């Protein structure tokens, strides 16, 4: 998620380079150090298969995990406003190589998952908090053909995210093949 973000804070200039692709600002190590790593069940509706209904929760493994702090505007070139923030790095500008890539880059960021926040967790302990008003931390996003998570799906025995992503890649390959086989106008 950090590598694919257009902007990352809590980092030093010359530290982590970004390649971009997701119009988001991430907050690095949002949950703390490695010793504060944890696992949490996540509702991931995008994993539902046709006719299945709500899928079972996915066990997210969060290790020094970032969160999406802000969805940034989709714009050409670098995120100039972000580059002026202290302790923030931005990805270099990139150009689409063809129409399919251009369409993917122009899409807006979709929020695919949130981790319920502190208020939601406290509400289950009898503390008088309106958990409905807190939406939680953004932990999975997609923009066009770029997908990023705060958690490590590869560290679980649950293959659903990998299967879903392989289907997304296959659809993108088919779309590119179809676009290349269409006659030029």
Go through each PLM region and give its residues.
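Cysteine-nucleophile active-site neighborhood
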Residues: 1-48
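Amide-donor transfer/coupling interface in amidating biosynthetic enzymes
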Residues: 28-35, 40-185
């Amino acid at each position: 998620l950090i590598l694919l973000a257009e902007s990352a804070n809590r980092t030093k200039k010359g530290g982590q380079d970004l390649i971009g692709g997701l119009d988001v600002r991430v907050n690095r190590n949002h949950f703390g150090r490695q010793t504060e790593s944890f696992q949490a069940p996540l509702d991931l509706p995008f994993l539902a298969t046709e006719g299945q209904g709500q899928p079972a929760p996915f066990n997210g493994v969060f290790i020094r995990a970032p969160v999406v702090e802000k969805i940034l505007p989709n714009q050409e070139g670098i995120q100039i406003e972000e580059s002026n923030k202290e302790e923030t790095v931005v990805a270099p500008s990139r150009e689409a190589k063809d129409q399919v890539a251009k369409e993917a880059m122009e899409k807006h960021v979709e929020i695919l998952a949130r981790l319920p926040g502190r208020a939601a967790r406290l509400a289950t302990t009898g503390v008088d908090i309106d958990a409905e008003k807190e939406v939680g931390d953004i932990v999975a996003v997609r923009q066009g053909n770029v997908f990023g998570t705060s958690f490590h799906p590869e560290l679980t025995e649950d293959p659903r995210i990998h299967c879903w992503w392989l289907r997304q890649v296959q659809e993108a390959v088919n779309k590119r093949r179809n676009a290349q086989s269409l006659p030029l106008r």
